[in-house]
Amino acid sequence: MLPASGLAVLLVTALKFSTAAPSLPAASPRTSRNNYRLAQAYLDKYYTKKGGPQIGEMVARGGNSTVKKIKELQEFFGLRVTGKLDRATMDVIKRPRCGVPDVANYRLFPGEPKWKKNTLTYRISKYTPSMTPAEVDRAMEMALRAWSSAVPLNFVRINAGEADIMISFETGDHGDSYPFDGPRGTLAHAFAPGEGLGGDTHFDNAEKWTMGTNGFNLFTVAAHEFGHALGLAHSTDPSALMFPTYKYQNPYGFRLPKDDVKGIQALYGPRRAFSGKPTAPHGPPHNPSIPDLCDSNLSFDAVTMLGKELLLFRDRIFWRRQVHLMSGIRPSTITSSFPQLMSNVDAAYEVAERGTAYFFKGPHYWITRGFQMQGPPRTIYDFGFPRYVQRIDAAVYLKDAQKTLFFVGDEYYSYDERKRKMEKDYPKSTEEEFSGVNGQIDAAVELNGYIYFFSGPKAYKSDTEKEDVVSELKSSSWIGC
């Protein structure tokens, strides 16, 4: 993995090429004229010295010999180096890929570009019609979290003003000298760390974006591009997220490959765990591993009761507090109490009558009695979820009804804890049933007959009998802010 500067572009090899006679070496009779044109366009784009009006000069390592370009391509992708357009080489050329040239070094920024601070802001200024805003928000958050899990960087979303990383979906010429070209051409591009356009990430609004596989997976593209926005170039490791060619990555349960971890930590160093010691009255000293206690944008991944304590999870840490007391609130690393979970708990709930709690992460869940894990992880499909559900956003146990509500995207399921069976006629619309909650539900917990829903930096108190929100607080107030 190499640091990068300048612009990075993720694209699918275009279908329109120059009709000029290609200057390629002789090939077998099976090699079609379309393959010649495709290869020439590919080599011109990724293995030839080019310039960019706002990006800076890109200097190729080698000469312009076509045979030499082919050999460079073959060497980069680990193919047999022949200088000929054999089948394996053409297979590589036809793959969707990122548009950063494999033989160039950008010169826009001196040295190895990286951010000089640990907390970066991001803002999504324009959305795509392919997905709901909540889905786009979630994809971006997950893509950034993939990187912050490995290095001491924190990402804070803002809704107005200029952010370090400005994210938008654009069409055609959008003012940065790198116009988009419509469906199945360039997918996205990102600028390396720096002032002005530095860090900005643009997605082609002409593409069909999705969180699944029926289109271009937004998480996959965003995670790759954010790697460039943080300062990484391409990797020659085919298993790496930063490998040049597009490869679908499942957003749920994704873990940054080792090569990417090595590269990003070379720039920013490893993320260090918090010591878990009690905090002073005004909060802990600054530590990049812990979200600022009184950050107005603080949100939680999961919230649950466990015995007489309330647990609130965020990234690699969780807070423990008494329900009716604000004193003694203390953060700890998740691994210190739940080593099997590591980090990033998706959802959690407790059935107090049984003395058991359930923790969800990706397509798996764990059962605990107190802080003691009860065996290995199990599959969430034990609950009766359809196979397309691959993670749970939030869960809350309703004591009187003896039912658990599971929130997945903009829908929710109802699970009968007595019958150990998912109820019929679900999922249902979360917005229709809980209309007072704005945004996707990240976490939920029932206390004293009320359901508290956490959505981003806000917590909503919902009266289950009136089916209405009765008050709204900042999520950070739950840890004493």
Curated annotation (Swiss-Prot):
Residues 21-105 form a propeptide. One of its GO terms (cellular component) is extracellular matrix. Ca(2+) 1 binds at E162, A163, D164, E195, G196, G198, D200. Glycans are attached at N64, N297. A motif (Cysteine switch) lies at residues 96-103. It is found in: Secreted, Extracellular space, Extracellular matrix. The active site is at E225. The conserved cysteine present in the cysteine-switch motif binds the catalytic zinc ion, thus inhibiting the enzyme. The dissociation of the cysteine from the zinc ion upon the activation-peptide release activates the enzyme. Belongs to the peptidase M10A family. This is Matrix metalloproteinase-20. The gene is MMP20.
